């Protein structure tokens, strides 16, 4: 299942500006601990480019969200309201693309834009994940397309 996170963010901006403004202006902490690797990051759920205001990244993974003990008390309820509104948009079947991957199928996506999930599965399967740094990706792209 795939959801265009930028589309969902734009829909939130149009339907609930207060929630949109909250999710673009508050930095949230994220942590992932596999036992072998501990990753920490922070940033707004919806990140806008500081130069032109376009969407640059969606951070939306409830499993990696750290405790909210750094938020002001009065902001906790606002955070959860905004998160509920954004979640409702992403959970709307009209905003989701569902498909079944066949064996040998490769799926490449922009992880900063495309939200992804899956449903239950019975039987055997093997999934392999691979991540490419956006700095590396765009650096190589710029080098390959640079006109001297």
Kindly give the residue locations of the regions a language model identified.
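Active-site environment of non-heme Fe oxygenases that use a 2-His-1-carboxylate facial triad
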Residues: 1-148
């Amino acid at each position: 299942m795939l959801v265009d996170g930028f589309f969902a963010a734009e829909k939130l901006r149009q339907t609930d500006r207060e929630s949109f403004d909250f999710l673009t202006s508050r930095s949230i902490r994220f942590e992932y601990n596999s036992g072998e690797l501990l990753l920490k990051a922070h940033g707004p759920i919806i990140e806008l480019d500081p130069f032109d205001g376009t969407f640059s990244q969606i951070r939306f993974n409830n499993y990696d969200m750290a405790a909210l003990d750094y938020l002001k008390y009065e902001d906790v309820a606002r955070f959860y309201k905004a998160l509920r509104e954004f979640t409702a948009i992403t959970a709307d079947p009209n905003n989701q693309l569902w498909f079944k991957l066949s064996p040998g199928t490769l799926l490449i996506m922009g992880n900063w834009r495309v939200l992804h999930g899956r449903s239950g599965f019975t039987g055997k399967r093997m999934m392999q994940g691979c991540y490419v740094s956006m700095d590396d990706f765009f650096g190589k792209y710029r080098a390959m397309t640079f006109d001297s």
